[in-house]
């Protein structure tokens, strides 16, 4: 009962971010429905990840596919003679996506579900990270919303030169054909799931007005997982 009394007020206090997270998931995942509908009228088959979708697919996609078919330690499988050697890339990212595919019975389903699930989780993490820094819900929501859709624009802030201003305007008003930033995997759609909790836990742990142990554990666990 005490846990319930402590959790419910916090949920109500931050309820808006949960509603917005659902909207983020719909926006990030909606393109799958539009593409399927378009292909359906033309008799095509839909694959959510192709080499044409993004250059990263040539490396990351085949690693997730290898895990899906049972090779849990997916090394540099794009080069046959290196496939059995230690991986120079993190192993946990393809394990997460490939394992989700095995759970759902299809890697395509895993890729589609990840667009509905992972960006909202990242959005919530961004919100609580910003709230920890500002203690203002409105500012935290603004930052999380801004970052989840146009994170690269942050690199041009403040626009103190004409070049930075031009770059900022380009990134705020992207091309309609560009993919959303957190659709890409492994980076940043999966890697942010580990870096955000690590940073949030670190901020909580170093606050002078708290002696929480869970924040130290959170920072330590996810900081360690970032290397895998």
Which residues does each predicted region cover?
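Hydrophobic membrane-insertion alpha-helices, especially the h-region
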Residues: 18-28
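Active-site lumenal/periplasmic loops and adjacent helix-entry segments of GT-C-fold
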Residues: 28-197, 227-228
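Membrane-interfacial, low-structure loops and terminal tails that flank and connect transmembrane helices
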Residues: 1-10, 207-218
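N-terminal membrane topogenic signal
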Residues: 6-20
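Membrane-interface alpha helices of multi-pass inner-membrane proteins
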Residues: 214-228
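Membrane-interfacial entry segments at the cytosolic side of transmembrane helices
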Residues: 12-15, 137-138, 212-214
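Membrane-interface transmembrane helices that cradle and orient dolichyl/undecaprenyl
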Residues: 190-215
């Amino acid at each position: 009962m005490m846990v319930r009394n402590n959790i419910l007020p916090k949920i109500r206090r931050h309820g808006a971010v949960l509603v917005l997270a659902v909207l983020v998931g719909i926006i990030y995942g909606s393109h799958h429905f539009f593409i399927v509908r378009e292909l359906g009228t033309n008799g095509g088959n839909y694959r959510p990840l192709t080499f044409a979708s993004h250059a990263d697919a040539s490396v990351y996609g085949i690693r997730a596919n290898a895990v899906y078919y049972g090779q849990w330690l997916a090394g540099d499988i794009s080069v046959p003679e290196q496939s059995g050697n230690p991986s120079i890339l993190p192993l946990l990212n393809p394990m997460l996506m490939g394992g989700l595919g095995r759970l759902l019975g299809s890697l395509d389903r895993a890729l589609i579900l990840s667009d509905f699930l992972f960006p909202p989780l990242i959005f919530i993490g961004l919100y609580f990270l910003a709230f920890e820094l500002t203690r203002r819900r409105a500012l935290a929501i603004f930052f999380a919303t801004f970052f989840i859709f146009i994170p690269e624009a942050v690199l041009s802030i403040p626009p103190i030169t004409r070049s930075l201003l031009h770059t900022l305007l380009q990134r705020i008003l992207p091309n309609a054909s560009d993919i959303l930033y957190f659709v890409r995997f492994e980076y940043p759609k999966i890697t942010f799931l580990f870096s955000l909790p690590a940073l949030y836990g670190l901020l909580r742990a170093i606050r002078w007005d708290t002696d929480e142990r869970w924040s130290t554990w959170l920072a330590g666990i996810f900081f360690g997982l970032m290397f895998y």
